[in-house]
């Protein structure tokens, strides 16, 4: 999928509009400042480094984040209509977490996390369209998201912290104690982490369906069969090198 300059800018403007509509002051102003400061980098960031993943193209990150925000609003309403206790969750909480859940994919405040790959073989055979910046110290995406927010002085609640940290659900083993607890007191105190995880999964799945699913099997057309039977010349050479009488008899009957 490719986006032109107008589409890239329109998507970024949409992202900013969610901040202005749903986030409360003073975080609204802090987030607008942060996202305007890093606009030139974020606007071209992919959501993934491999073609087989979701939105692995320039502009894919903002495209994905916008989709997660929209899906999170849908999920929030679904949980409300289903009777969930949402008394401690606001739209500010929902949009803040959806907006920043993957912020760590940006990299550090100074360096990008990924660059377009120049390795033709890896691009064509492995679908690795981007390579990771090894100058950066390793952090998981959620941890780097949280680090960038605190570095920018943007605060959050305990529920928001847990939500961003665990948004990958059980795809990340580090989240197992949060999602597989048999002690009632250790379960999520609000469904906010579940709302964001659900929204992220749904957005990523739909993007994958639209972008990659139609390509599966397209390059696997049947190849012409190669005749691998022995001609008389090859058979004679093979028989002369075989010492086992049984194997020689088997080859002679091919």
Question: What do these predicted ranges mean?
Answer:
Residues 1-31, 52-54, 71-81, 192-254:
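Histidine-centered, transition-metal-coordinating active-site segments
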Residues 55-57, 63, 75, 87-215:
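Divalent metal-dependent catalytic cores for phosphoryl transfer on phosphate-bearing substrates
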Residues 1-125:
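Acidic/His-rich, divalent-metal-binding segments that scaffold phosphate/diphosphate chemistry
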């Amino acid at each position: 999928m490719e986006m032109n300059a107008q589409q890239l800018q329109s998507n970024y403007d949409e992202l900013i509009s969610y901040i202005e509509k749903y986030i409360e002051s003073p975080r609204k102003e802090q987030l607008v400042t942060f996202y305007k400061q890093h606009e030139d980098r974020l606007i071209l960031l992919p959501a993934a480094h491999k073609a087989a993943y979701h939105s692995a193209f320039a502009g894919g990150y903002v495209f994905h984040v916008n989709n997660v925000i929209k899906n999170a609003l849908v999920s929030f309403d679904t949980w409300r209509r289903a009777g969930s206790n949402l008394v401690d969750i606001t739209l500010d909480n929902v949009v803040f977490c959806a907006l920043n859940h993957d912020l760590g994919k940006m990299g550090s405040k100074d360096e990008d996390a990924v660059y377009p790959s120049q390795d033709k073989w890896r691009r064509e055979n492995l679908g690795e369209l981007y390579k990771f910046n090894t100058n950066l110290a390793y952090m998981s995406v959620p941890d780097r998201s949280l680090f960038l927010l605190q570095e920018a002085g943007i605060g959050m609640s305990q529920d928001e912290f847990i939500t961003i940290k665990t948004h990958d659900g059980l795809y990340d083993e580090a989240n197992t104690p949060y999602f597989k607890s048999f002690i009632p007191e250790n379960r999520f105190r609000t469904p906010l982490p579940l709302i964001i995880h659900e929204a992220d999964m749904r957005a990523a799945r739909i993007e994958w369906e639209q972008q990659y699913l139609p390509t599966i099997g397209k390059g696997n057309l049947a190849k012409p069969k190669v005749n691998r039977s022995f001609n008389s010349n090859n058979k004679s050479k093979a028989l002369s090198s075989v010492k086992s009488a049984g194997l020689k008899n088997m080859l002679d009957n091919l």
